[in-house]
A protein has these predicted regions:
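N-terminal/domain-start alpha-helical segments
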Residues: 1-128
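Short, flexible hinge/linker loops that cap or flank conserved catalytic cores
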Residues: 2-4, 75, 127, 132, ...
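Short, Lys/Arg-enriched segments at the junction into DNA-binding effector domains
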Residues: 8, 119-174, 178, 226-232
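A short, glycine- and basic residue-enriched loop/turn
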Residues: 15, 57-58, 66, 87-89, ...
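Glycine-rich nucleotide-binding loop
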Residues: 41, 221-225
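Positively charged, aromatic-enriched patches within helix-turn-helix-type DNA-binding elements
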Residues: 146-222
């Protein structure tokens, strides 16, 4: 997947493995990557480098991620900022957005989700339309978190939306029930993979009431696959 198009991104992350993995994937996607290992380095790099976008972990040593964001915004740095949160915690999200961040990704995440968020932020920063994922007649707006099938709005619950977004981001790939379960729950909650079967069943009925599109395939013992190909324009 490529989508960086030479854009310069600052990655502020203290976890070595995650930092190096993300950096490698971002470079592979076409980004030029600067890295910082703590909050103080992040502020310095964020002020000194000509950036297009920044990724900031909230749990940083020396200076918390929220303070990094506040200082960059106080210095009138207007490039988009994507925050990484330790878990799907509403308070982290709210505080991050209030500090000046533009979007968030909760751990654990897949790189495809990070890339989609970055591309969305860069499109908006460039004054482009809100980014959409399109697979056949199914259109998912990653910013507004809305879904349409053949231009007709489909009402989804939060959990249904999360499942659909994850499947569409990785259209054509086999996604295990375990992986989908991790997309739904905080790490502290007891996970029930049977819930995934229920949600996928509801998604099928809502997206494909006539059973014509068959957008979500079940692969017994392996998981699920979104069977409709992604449009090139939505990559």
């Amino acid at each position: 997947i490529r989508g960086g198009a030479g854009m310069r991104v600052l990655l502020v992350e203290d976890e070595t493995v995650l930092r190096e993995t993300l950096k490698a994937r971002l470079v592979e996607a076409g980004f030029t990557v600067d890295v910082a290992q703590d909050g103080e380095e992040g502020v310095f790099a964020g002020l000194e480098y000509p950036l297009d976008v920044a990724i900031v972990d909230l749990g940083l040593p020396k200076l918390p991620g929220l303070e990094v964001i506040r200082r960059l915004r106080a210095a009138r740095k207007t490039y988009p900022i994507l925050i990484l949160t330790a878990r799907d915690n509403w308070q982290d999200k709210v505080e991050g957005l209030q500090a000046g961040a533009d979007d968030y990704v909760a751990k654990p995440f897949h790189f495809e989700e990070v890339l989609a968020r970055l591309q969305a932020l860069l499109r908006r920063a460039g004054g482009w339309a809100s980014p959409e994922l399109k697979c056949g007649p199914i259109m998912l707006d990653t910013r507004a978190q809305t879904v349409k099938v053949a231009d007709a709005a489909v009402d989804l619950t939060t959990f249904e939306y999360r499942i659909l977004e994850h499947l569409m981001l990785r259209a054509g790939e086999v996604i295990s029930k375990t992986e989908l379960t991790e997309r739904l729950y905080d790490q502290d909650f007891e996970r029930d993979s049977n819930v995934i079967e229920v949600l996928v069943g509801r998604l099928r009925r809502k997206l494909d009431p006539q059973d014509e599109l068959k957008p979500i395939e079940t692969l017994r013992g392996r998981g699920y696959r979104f069977a409709l190909a992604r449009d090139q324009a939505s990559r």
